[in-house]
């Protein structure tokens, strides 16, 4: 069925499953992946994954990327773009923070945008440490 004919939950499941088909296939080494929580301005802990390239672990500072998955603010997840974030971190030699921002329709605008801004501020503060 087309996505617009599915329930929100069905659309999210279909999106995650179809995203697995776009796995870029990363050769070893795989990046280090840390699951963490980024604090939102309202105190909500937002799930996130931090991908760090294996080969550059001795480098004192690496470029950082805040990765916000696609999906029109309704579908998409940390899992739907996991392989892409891993590939980006390893191939570009950067740290990638992938954020599980809050999705519509459960969360109204501008929640997702605020979550993204909060994650950006968190990433910048962590980089300065």
Language-model-detected regions and their locations in the chain:
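A glycine/proline-hinged amphipathic helix-loop "lid/cap" segment
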Residues: 1-46, 50
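Serine-hydrolase catalytic-loop signature spanning alpha/beta hydrolases and amidase-signature enzymes
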Residues: 67, 72-75, 80, 96, ...
């Amino acid at each position: 069925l087309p996505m617009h004919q599915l329930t929100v939950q069905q659309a999210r499941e279909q999106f995650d499953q179809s995203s697995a088909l776009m796995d870029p296939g990363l050769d070893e080494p795989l990046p280090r992946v840390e699951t963490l929580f980024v604090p939102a301005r309202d105190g909500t802990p937002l799930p996130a994954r931090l991908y760090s390239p294996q080969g550059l672990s001795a480098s004192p500072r690496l470029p950082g990327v805040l990765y916000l998955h696609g999906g029109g603010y309704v579908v998409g997840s940390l899992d739907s773009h996991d392989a892409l974030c891993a590939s980006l971190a390893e191939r570009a030699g950067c740290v990638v923070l992938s954020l599980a921002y809050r999705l519509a329709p459960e969360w109204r605008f501008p929640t997702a945008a605020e979550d993204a801004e909060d994650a950006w501020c968190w990433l910048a503060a962590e980089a300065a440490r």
